[in-house]
């Protein structure tokens, strides 16, 4: 029996538009609720949300069998950390601040068993292999790994074509906020030079045959990124949605006469 098929990876490769949402509460119950909305993918955020290995593992568990595919964003691309979340059952990783083809190649290798990589083979301890109940897991897992790298600096943009040429990079996610900050526009990704850079990057990603991803929260920007070619598009953040709805509801009834 082989490793479970990563249907998100195959959908990305086909160019389907996949709509996602950030799961930032670091809580399995909240992530399970979010999955009932039917998003194609959910980011379990280990970079800016208060997640650790146990909370990530718990969220992976509640998403098993759900339509929403878990994308685990790690705080960094360290091989030991990659190994742990893959053993916990993740198949798709989003790695921030990738700025070179060399970094991308190292990430590809960290996600794969030898001879294609350096992932440790302790699968008997791992949920990923159903605790050794999938006899062919190690032999087949490499083909189901999906690597998404974040390009969010000028250095990353300069190296984009080389990153896209790395075998094993399934998609590139543009980080508008950090890119804008690195270009001298802290907190304002709407500046013309930032927008032009994003549009060009998304086009180059799709031309290279890779999936292009990005996050936006307002309707106009979401439509613009979609029209520019983004095909794994995050359209919400759960923490933001709760905060906005809570404030709007209270404001409405405080002022109602």
From Swiss-Prot:
Highest taxon above the source species: Bacteria
SUPFAM superfamilies found in the cross-reference section: Phosphoenolpyruvate/pyruvate domain (SSF51621)
GO CC terms in record: cytoplasm
InterPro entries associated with the record: Aldolase/citrate-lyase_domain, HpcH-HpaI_aldolase, Pyrv/PenolPyrv_kinase-like_dom, Pyrv_kinase-like_dom_sf
Catalytic residues (UniProt): 48 (proton acceptor)
Marked site: Transition state stabilizer: 73
EC category name: lyase
Catalytic reactions on record: D-glyceraldehyde + 3-hydroxypyruvate = 2-dehydro-D-gluconate; D-glyceraldehyde + pyruvate = 2-dehydro-3-deoxy-L-galactonate; 2-dehydro-3-deoxy-D-gluconate = D-glyceraldehyde + pyruvate
Cofactor: a divalent metal cation
Site annotation Increases basicity of active site His: residues: 87
Name listed for the protein in its UniProt record: Hydroxypyruvate/pyruvate aldolase
Species per Swiss-Prot/TrEMBL record: Roseovarius nubinhibens (strain ATCC BAA-591 / DSM 15170 / ISM)
Top-level taxonomy: Bacteria, Pseudomonadati, Pseudomonadota, Alphaproteobacteria, Rhodobacterales
């Amino acid at each position: 029996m082989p490793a479970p098929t990563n249907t998100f990876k195959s959908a990305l490769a086909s160019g389907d538009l996949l709509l996602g949402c950030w799961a930032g509460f670091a809580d399995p119950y909240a992530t399970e609720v979010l999955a009932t909305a039917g998003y194609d993918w959910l980011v379990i955020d280990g970079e800016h949300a208060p997640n650790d290995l146990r909370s990530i593992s718990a969220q992976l568990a509640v998403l098993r069998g759900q339509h929403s595919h878990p994308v685990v964003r790690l705080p960094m691309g360290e091989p030991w950390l990659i190994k742990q979340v893959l053993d916990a059952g993740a198949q798709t990783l989003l790695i921030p601040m990738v700025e070179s083809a060399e970094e991308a190649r190292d990430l590809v290798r960290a996600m794969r068993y030898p001879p294609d990589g350096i992932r440790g083979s302790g699968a008997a301890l791992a949920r990923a292999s159903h605790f050794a109940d999938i006899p062919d897991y190690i032999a087949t897992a490499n083909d189901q790994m999906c690597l998404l790298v974040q390009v969010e600096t000028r250095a990353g943009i300069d190296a984009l074509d080389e990153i896209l040429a790395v075998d094993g990079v399934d998609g590139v996610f543009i980080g508008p906020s950090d890119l804008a900050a690195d270009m001298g526009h802290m907190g304002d990704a709407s500046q013309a030079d930032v927008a032009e850079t994003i549009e060009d990057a998304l086009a180059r990603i799709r031309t290279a045959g890779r999936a292009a991803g990005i996050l936006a929260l307002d309707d106009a920007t979401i439509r613009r990124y979609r029209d520019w070619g983004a095909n794994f598009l995050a359209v919400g953040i759960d923490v933001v949605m709760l905060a906005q709805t809570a404030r709007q509801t209270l404001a409405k009834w405080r002022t109602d006469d």
